């Protein structure tokens, strides 16, 4: 072998050795860099928490089973005076329990007084028979009957009604009645699921569900109530019924709907339970609500 050939081979070995060192260094340094990079990526602060993956619609059957016995149907009867020349009909909203009656029978009996009936919902807050409902459900009624889910019926006394908040308190003579658990609407968030139980069109213990659409909603001429807006199906007869959160707690009283057709259009409004319970406390104590004035 000549010297020139030997030098070439040694040069090749030297080059291969260098390449081998570079390759080893590259392979050796690749893994630690990747691990360090991955570790940095994992520990880096995240702009927003990851949202839980959807798991399907919530099962509300347990809430209904637990609370339906404490939701009541409220039937009212009253008298309306009419004259032939100028029928004296009150201005009613589509959600009012008397609305459908007047729509169908307006002008049918032109003279004297007419006996009218209506329906709404309510719920028991004390086992000795204290019930919350809407003031407009019992407005003008001289007879109020409460029907429980177990078909028992009681004559109810109107302890008091506050038109400003649309809250009324009824009392029946009974003991050991099922009651709802009240929660805090202030802890609610837009987008949360809610459930209503009531008697739409007289169909007792009907459950409907939806989400909270907005909180602290102000409505025209409603200065005292920061309404909970939902898309829960609420129809005539639901008025006065409870609105539950997914913990099975009452967070509101279904009170009004917004509709151009007279039926449900996805805009329902509930009175926060905190407002209702403050009114209940005053009505139970004095029969009226006192408000501070400047």
Which residue ranges define each predicted feature?
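N-terminal Lys/Arg-rich, disordered targeting/topogenic segments
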Residues: 1-6
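Serine-dependent protease modules
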Residues: 9-14, 20-294
